[in-house]
């Protein structure tokens, strides 16, 4: 059956939800001009709705519920369901794994009173460790009505996330899917795994252009900011596109409104705040009870330790992937070995390397890392414009164009040589991998062919690198310079060459080859930039966005996701690799950015603003959305190191990894990723198991292929819980994996049990 995008109408949206969503956007627009950047991440420790009036309201509701016969029935049925769920989650001595069918049922499948589910056997042993169990009232401090409302709303949000993830071939955890799905309904494995091209074998040429599949001759046209595919001219004239899921803006706005309304709902905020506090406390208790058991498990694991487990730098920009000393050394080397080489042309006059430095009145011999001035310092804190200037060595854009760009007189040779030196260092380390970002701006469709040519001509491929394309959100700059007529043209320049290379790879061999090693897209720029526009179904379509105003963040994300979704389905149909959408999100700016990413992104970079929204933070936990965090980068730009939420997120069970962002600006040593791990371990006193868990997360989040992940993490890495962990490869204790899995199942069971309770009450009536 063809995959189609399920559509909704604005008329389906509840008026109360619509008003709440608009209030959130309006509040954000008001706050953008008045907020104090220094208090951006200051979050009160008390409960979000813990004021006196709210507490009194909750108390009155509790007292009213105690007198309600209907509530008494619901509580009784819920306690029975909860006891069954708990019995399934707590392994017995003979228990060998999780139930073969999820203990959770669909709300449309009522539980038969008195029936008990039987856990099936799984082919692995559940580790023995000390578990902490909470019994008694299911939600002290929150009424049954509020609890059921919060649980149903959270479950609906997860279902919305699952819909967008499945359609774009993004990842969604199988455990969460099973708790949301109908009983016995299994989620196909291939649906949950992105399709990355495996690395070439040692005897294969990574630059071979002869394996392109045949051309299809499909036609592509942009409509409303999204590229549509047509089988032939006749189908184009009939407006009958090729059978692929095409996004619908109205549906997206309805779904986003539901999430926006949810994050402002008082009872839901209270419930999520309490659950997050519980998760953090539960991990502290787990550490106290099982730290030595985990350590013994790691000590008995031969050959493997923190140094020789695979780690991936999941967020790094290619233009700053080398440290400042490396850049300085390379500049001096090129000046010493080829000072008379022609490196630029200006007004028809060829310029040598010596003349470039003479025009800047400097001698490379006298340069130091301090005079190079590419490191972020105190003056860049809350100054993104000052940070961007650090990409210019000694403040000279000429040196940036010469050494850190792919398009220049030398065809990006110097930049390629430096990237290859960084790649060789990774290969020598054996256990470190990297996912550098290369820029596509959307000024011209020729950017893609130029970038692919740079990659092949300079032989930049490395088995320890996978590439991500970053799209800077700077349409306003190009429009003001009359380089683009509309935002739609920018989208077309970014995505049309990819569709053409997918449909007719024989005609675009270089780009087809380059795309094998590209695993995702990123959206980058200063998130704190103010936008006066509120994205809605009434927003102008991209081809009509002709003003010099930059579209808001959520506008960028929707149209990037929409085109990636169609492209991924087309490529999957052709048996080609697919792409993940991995935007920068939650570093600064509005909380609505994280709502947009919740719907559209496979994973995000930074995520600091999750600290401000308990509902979103809890949703990111339940959906296990990967977050690549860069505390050293944040320390120089937005948030001092000690206040970074990485440790807190890790303890709660969010899927976090460590990344460097920009080693040239933030790091001092040759191994920037190890520097990141070392500082985190020292500041937060992370254990070996903590570090190895973060490293394992980084491999799972990365664009490494299925075959590589099996080699680095174990044959069953895609399974969740201890069954998916091979301690011989990951050095993560099975006790830790079992704790994470059982805790997630427990949190998910709260949602499913609330929905079952409602069904049983209705059945009894």
Curated annotation (Swiss-Prot):
Expressed in adult tissues such as aorta, heart, kidney, lung, muscle and thyroid. Weakly expressed in thyroid and not detected in liver. Binds 1 zinc ion per subunit. It comes from the Eukaryota. Gene3D superfamilies: 4.10.800.20, Metal-dependent hydrolases. GO terms for cellular component: cytosol. Belongs to the metallo-dependent hydrolases superfamily. Adenosine and AMP deaminases family. AMP deaminase plays a critical role in energy metabolism. This is AMP deaminase 3. It comes from Rattus norvegicus. The gene is Ampd3.
